[in-house]
């Protein structure tokens, strides 16, 4: 599953523009009430939210599978990394065969770099912004995770990813694109104190050559 376009809300576009341009060094374009960030294969778009809006999203960027230590050094020289309650700032998943780190953008969204070691995308050049390959995960909270996961799997033709259905946390999709489905109110990893919430989102995905769009709260697939 490929996430071609991801549209989110934010309260202040200017700090987001400066963050993605200066910290992650990604191409950005601010026009009117929208900010376009070119994140590799994905168009990441932030729309101006109404005054008083609150909310933090979780989304993730794939990086080349051999670049994790270099990506960590590159990013940690610019901004603090998020840590768990033991002080760890890198996280290995045996079941996913992946290594991750977490950080926040200017709006407080929980971002992630993940190196998926089963992917054949190694590079030999030093880590740079061009190795932010695509948005590969977006968190979508719901009140009933199992029902939501079953509905999405049926409509999109994807499967639960490397685990069984779980009523508090279920990922669906594949290594190129995952919907991360937590129960509403679950705290985003690692020890962020930020609860997953049902927030407005619009995401265009491609599954086996077929295009789908998920939008709104509650989310609808078209």
Model-derived regions, located:
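Hydrophobic, well-structured mid-protein blocks that either form specific transmembrane helices
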Residues: 87-131
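A short, sequence-level motif marking secondary-structure junctions
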Residues: 49-53, 117-119, 184-189, 219
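Short glycine-enriched loop/turn motifs at secondary-structure junctions
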Residues: 1-2, 53-55, 95, 131-134, ...
